[in-house]
Design a protein with these regions (language model features):
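Terminal amphipathic alpha-helical/low-complexity segments used for targeting or macromolecular assembly
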Residues: 1-203
Length: 204
């Protein structure tokens, strides 16, 4: 369903791209360009996305940094949570810690909401207040060779609510790895992670 009174767009990243050709929006995420995937995420969440021109000041504005990957579920959760003041996305849990480790000191902002009224400015984007989101994560265990890695397994936090920068090639790689499972489950089974887990538990 379309959300009234809001619109989405991009703001440019101050972080230099590393390791792969740019621009960031043309790099590949989950089989298509990052720019296309991000636009779909907003549109699937019911939010009009405008790639060019200033956004209308009489609407609430969601602004995502040009190098950031975001899923529909992350957009939906953030849109449901924002109020009447400017806000910036933050996420807790293991996923938040994992993405923070991969950010190489880049703490954003990556996604902000600016309330209606007043222009979009870099200062306003930077001053948006943090809004901590529930990551709704699941931990998946992957076996390792204890002789080589010093541990028998590693736990990765997987969530439908993924949002992370991709300016560095390693970040883009992880964005594809972390996003692949939820992407495949949603597209092949028409379900989110929780529904898949419940379906599996019921079958057992």
């Amino acid at each position: 369903n379309k959300r009234n009174g809001v619109v989405a767009g991009r703001f440019e990243s101050p972080v230099s791209l590393e390791g792969l050709a740019g621009p960031a929006t043309e790099r590949i995420w989950l089989g298509r360009s990052l720019g296309e995937r991000v636009e779909w995420s907003f549109m699937e969440a019911g939010i009009e996305f405008r790639d060019e021109g200033p956004l209308p000041e009489d609407r609430g504005r969601f602004l995502i940094r040009s190098d950031v990957a975001v899923t529909r579920d992350a957009v939906t959760a953030f849109a449901d949570a924002v109020g009447t003041t400017d806000a910036r996305w933050e996420v807790g849990g293991r996923l938040g810690n994992f993405v923070a480790d991969l950010s190489f000191g880049d703490d954003g902002p990556w996604l902000v909401y600016l309330a209606p009224g007043g222009p979009v400015t870099p200062e306003r984007i930077a001053q948006a207040e943090p809004l901590t989101m529930d990551s709704k994560e699941r931990l998946l265990e992957f076996p390792l060779s204890e002789d080589h890695h010093g541990a028998s397994m590693v736990e990765l936090p997987i969530s439908d609510r993924l949002l992370m920068p991709t300016s560095h090639w390693l970040q883009l790689l992880w964005a594809n790895l972390l996003g692949l499972g939820p992407f495949l489950w949603r597209n092949l089974m028409g379900s989110n992670i929780l529904q898949v887990a419940l379906r599996g538990a019921w079958a057992a």
